[in-house]
Swiss-Prot record:
The keyword Cell membrane does not apply. Residues 1-282 are annotated as: Disordered. The keyword DNA-binding applies. Keywords: DNA-binding. PROSITE patterns: HMG_BOX_2. This is HMG box-containing protein R545. Residues 70-87, 127-153, 253-273 have a biased composition (Basic residues). Coiled coil: none annotated. Residues 183-252 bind DNA. It comes from Acanthamoeba polyphaga mimivirus. One of its GO terms (molecular function) is DNA binding.
Length: 282
């Protein structure tokens, strides 16, 4: 019974072991002789041995190639139980093949696990990328530029602000009187003469400019009055008439004249020696 299970489990291994045993028996039966036919036979046998070895190596390579082809199912299965094998080279060959198969299976398992891990790592990343798109930062709105005001409107606004400024002041606008309320200065005789004579000259000589009428009226005034432009005397009751300062002057306005210093007395000039000698002689 154990022999049959061995042949079913690993038929290739049994065939390799049988070939090796046949080769070993033939080598033992060949007598060693010098030269001749026996020598040729001995030379031919190593070729057969090498061919059998090559066939065994090819079969082992095929078994190694078939092991990864079985896929994930064979790689995950538990290693097959070792069948009882004949003593000698069969044990070593079977052990080597099982070790190689187990190594190939472990490598395949590691590759499968690493591929699964890589797929599992990449899958959630893709989902996360789809679910959570990158939020765009809200673009800052540029402050709207104010359109430059037209020059005409700006001037009007400035004028209005200037007009409103005195109204908002602290009573200054009320205290100041308008120009119409101020008393007008009385016209001089020269101005009165011009106001009468100018329209007469326009009627006499129409079509001339205003300045020429002024010159003509001024020339007539100088001929009549000798070139003096007298102003009318101020009325007694007018507010604008200035009071004449009192004679003698007030104490505040009158300036005291500085007292004159007495002239310093001159020192008598020294007499010369000649005059002194003359007086003594007298």
């Amino acid at each position: 019974m154990p022999k049959k299970t061995a042949t079913k489990a690993n038929p290739k291994e049994v065939s390799d072991s049988e070939n090796d045993s046949v080769v070993s028996e033939e080598e033992d039966n060949v007598p060693v002789t010098k030269g001749g036919k026996n020598a040729k036979a001995s030379k031919a046998k190593p070729k057969e041995v090498s061919e059998s070895d090559n066939s065994g190596s090819e079969q082992s390579e095929e078994s190694e190639d078939e092991a990864p082809k079985k896929g994930k199912v064979n790689a995950k299965k538990a290693p097959a139980k070792k069948a009882p094998v004949k003593k000698g080279k069969q044990d070593s060959d079977s052990d080597n093949e099982e070790d190689e198969a187990s190594e190939d299976g472990s490598d395949d398992e590691e590759d499968v696990v690493s591929a699964d891990d890589s797929d599992s790592d990449e899958a959630p990343k893709g989902k996360a990328a789809k679910k959570a798109p990158a939020k765009k930062a809200p673009a800052k709105k540029a402050p709207a530029k104010k359109a430059p005001a037209k020059k005409g409107k700006a001037k009007d606004e400035d004028d209005e602000s200037e007009d409103e400024a005195p109204k908002k002041g602290k009573g200054k606008g009320k205290a100041t009187k308008k120009d119409g309320d101020k008393p007008k200065k009385p016209l001089s005789d020269y101005q009165k003469f011009l106001s009468k004579r100018m329209p007469e000259l326009r009627e006499e000589e129409p079509g001339k400019p205003y300045k020429e009428y002024m010159k003509m009226a001024g020339a007539e005034w100088t001929e009549q009055n000798g070139g003096t432009k007298k102003k009318p005397a101020a009325k007694s009751g007018s507010k604008t008439a200035k009071k004449a300062p009192a004679k003698g002057g007030s104490k505040s306005t009158a300036k005291k004249a500085p007292a004159k210093k007495a002239p310093a007395k001159k020192a008598p000039a020294k007499k010369s020696k000649k005059e002194a000698s003359d007086e003594e002689s007298d």
